[in-house]
């Protein structure tokens, strides 16, 4: 996205969100002004996707939209103006993966929801290893982010009653992965670091939102360090 389009797009996003929501940001004040990294967040609603544009004044955010939305004119327009991509989430979309890696290596920011789908309950569900694969291949750090208040049901219910939303976005600490592992141990190591990402997100969430990671030993370790 060029700088002018980014400024206009971000202005609109921020204006709309401020119109309907009180947004609390925690931990975003020390983010680097340049350099590639992956934001890994929980996925609780459609409004999640707007938060990076509210928070980050960076024109190199990498937007991806599920291929199933390509039939809608709004999403085609959105992908075009943001220089985004449609991606097949159910199969290995090699072209989209390669382009994402290229942009990450060039210093872009990629937001991914490791769970792969919206959690209907708002609680964490079991994640997939996509974030770890991309971080390994691109050689970039991961920033865990926890969101609350963006749940689709909550958004609809409050807006129907003309009540403002209360959205909270909390960033944790960057962490980098060790060198990529190959061979027999690869799957187990990817699972280990996927759990690491999710436990770091869980540590930023209220206890009732930690879902399947609530009793994870690594989460207990992280909470004891806070």
Q: For each predicted feature, which ranges?
A:
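Catalytic-site beta-strand/loop segments enriched in glycine and acidic/polar residues
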Residues: 103-131
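Catalytic core of membrane glycerolipid acyltransferases/transacylases, capturing the structured
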Residues: 3-6, 10, 18, 32-91
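Hydrophobic/aromatic ligand-binding patch that stacks against planar heteroaromatic rings
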Residues: 55, 78, 102, 133-137
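A cross-family acyltransferase "interaction/gating" segment
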Residues: 31, 123-188, 192, 218-225
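Short gly/ser/thr-rich secondary-structure transition/capping motifs
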Residues: 18-26, 151-153
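Membrane-interfacial terminal anchoring regions of lipid-handling membrane enzymes
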Residues: 1-11, 15, 24-33, 102-105, ...
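Helix-adjacent hinge/juxtasegments
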Residues: 85-107
